[in-house]
């Protein structure tokens, strides 16, 4: 049987900060329940959890759990049914769901936030939240990824957003928010994906057309993307924040990071139609 406090201490001993150790335990439990359920092909994992797993870098650890539903309803009753089924997985952990599910509506995202409590048989409990959206474009294929759940000493496969989709969704969000963006860590995610991600450029171009060029009114070419990013990157407030060390999880010079991003988008220009 899993002891939540012992599991948290396990990750602390491996070098995680307390909050991230607690979050990692919650992520392991929730994702392993999904992997062991009939919903494993109806859910794709996204966001910081994926970035942390593909980078294998504790500096990119996250407290968030973000998933998208595939061919499954986002209605509250459907979400509650999903968690009810996950609760039937016999792993010694019970999920208590706050039934006041919050509607999330942002410029580039609509979904639901579910606050949950995980309880073990030793009367320990931890809280976490899960943001749930919908994977609407079924033509955008998801990738199978092997997660290592150290709490269970096991590995299991789940669907995740591809690196290319992660990159372009972050890019689309930044273009939509412009200089008002607060997603400074995304800058360093871009750099990692460009330099280490070995992205498929043909897929990247396809997604840039879907998410950016065909979806944002003022963006018609990659030149428009470069110009908008340059405007953002030269904004004094943005520069001050993005240089904060708590966002720079890769430890690279910020000017090098920003120039690498711009150069990468520029060299895609002849390929985007």
Model-found features: residue ranges?
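Glycine-rich beta-strand-to-loop/alpha-helix junction loops that act as flexible
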Residues: 45-49
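Structured mid-to-C-terminal alpha-helical surface segments
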Residues: 1-43, 53-61, 65, 69-273
């Amino acid at each position: 049987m899993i002891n939540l406090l012992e599991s948290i201490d396990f990750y602390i001993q491996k070098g995680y900060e307390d909050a991230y150790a607690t979050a990692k335990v919650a992520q392991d439990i929730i994702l392993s329940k999904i992997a062991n359920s009939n919903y494993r092909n109806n859910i794709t994992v996204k966001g910081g959890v994926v970035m942390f797993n593909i980078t294998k870098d504790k500096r990119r650890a996250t407290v968030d759990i973000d998933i998208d539903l595939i061919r499954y309803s986002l209605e509250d009753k459907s979400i509650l049914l999903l968690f009810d089924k996950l609760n039937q997985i016999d792993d010694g952990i019970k999920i208590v769901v706050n039934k006041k599910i919050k509607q999330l509506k942002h410029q580039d995202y609509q979904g639901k936030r579910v606050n949950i409590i995980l309880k073990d048989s030793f009367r320990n409990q931890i809280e976490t939240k899960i943001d749930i959206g919908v994977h609407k474009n079924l033509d955008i294929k998801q990738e199978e990824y092997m997660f290592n759940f150290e709490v269970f000493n096991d590995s299991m496969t789940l669907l995740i957003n591809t690196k290319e989709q992660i990159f372009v969704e972050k890019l689309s969000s930044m273009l939509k928010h412009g200089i008002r963006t607060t997603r400074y860590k995304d800058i360093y995610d871009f750099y990692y994906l460009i330099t280490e991600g070995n992205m498929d450029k043909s897929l990247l171009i396809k997604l840039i057309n879907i998410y950016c060029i065909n979806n944002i009114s003022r963006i018609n070419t990659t030149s428009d993307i470069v110009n908008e990013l340059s405007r953002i990157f030269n904004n004094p407030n943005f520069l001050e924040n993005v240089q904060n060390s708590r966002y720079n999880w890769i430890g690279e010079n910020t000017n090098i990071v920003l120039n690498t991003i711009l150069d990468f988008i520029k060299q895609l220009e002849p390929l985007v139609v």
